[in-house]
Amino acid sequence: VREYAYLLDVTVRFEADQVQDERGTTKDGQKIYTLGDVYPHADMVTYPSSIEGFGNAFLEAVYYKRLILVNNYSIYEVDIKPKGFHTLWFDGFISNNTLNAVRNALKHPELTHEWAETNYQLAKRYFSYTILERRLESIVADCLGYQI
């Protein structure tokens, strides 16, 4: 990926050594950041893989109100996309249409901010802890035969 980015003259930063679960410093004194420190600086978050879990990383990008480019993997297609999230997506490979859509979105931050806010509200509606709690209570009640 590094070589490909270099060939295309695309600035990409790989910061795995400096992004951890907790803030701190490395042995040589460099700062260690968290994802919460990094997300606000991303122009776009990408999920190019064809196999993903439910979408915790997707929800993180929504929480931090970032533009999202996602491969149309099966769980996204079935469980996330139908909720109405505004994303840029592709089916298995990046086409010229995908590239043009990304360029257009990056040139119109007012549009991507609107999408991000809509996505945030949709996530609150469908995937918040309150919703999780209600659904778990219902499942437990079904198993036990009474409300807890």
Regions found by a protein language model. Give the residues of each.
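Nucleotide-activated donor-binding/catalytic signature segment of Leloir-type glycosyltransferases, i.e.
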Residues: 1-37
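Short glycine/serine-rich donor-binding loops of glycosyltransferases
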Residues: 35, 55-58, 76
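A short hydrophobic beta-strand element within the catalytic core of glycosyltransferases
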Residues: 45-46
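Aromatic "clamp/platform" in nucleotide-sugar-dependent glycosyltransferases that forms part
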Residues: 50
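Donor-sugar nucleotide-binding helix/loop cap in glycosyltransferases
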Residues: 61
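Short hydrophobic beta-strand element within catalytic cores of glycosyltransferases
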Residues: 67-71, 87-88
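A charged, aromatic-enriched C-terminal amphipathic alpha-helix characteristic of glycosyltransferases
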Residues: 107-141
